[in-house]
Amino acid sequence: MEHFLQKQWEEKEDKLYKAVIFKDFQEAFTFIIKVAFLAEKYNHHPKWINEYNKVELWLYTHEVGNLVTEKDRTMAIEIDKLLMPDIEE
């Protein structure tokens, strides 16, 4: 998967945020599907926007007043692993 990656997650308005630009819509949508499976596995679902080859993600936890928790940080790490499959666990 070829993409431009915002290196770090930003903390914006009490949410973790990342934007990723892919080669095309198909690669962006493939990434979204992979994130959907992760979200189900962790029972933690991101807010996202997809416009053609760009995917924007926000992570936050509803149960604590829409703030960032360890659950969000864990999900961010798992999403990053999808973007960099050669990361060692």
Residue ranges of model-derived segments:
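Charge-rich alpha-helical segments
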Residues: 1-89
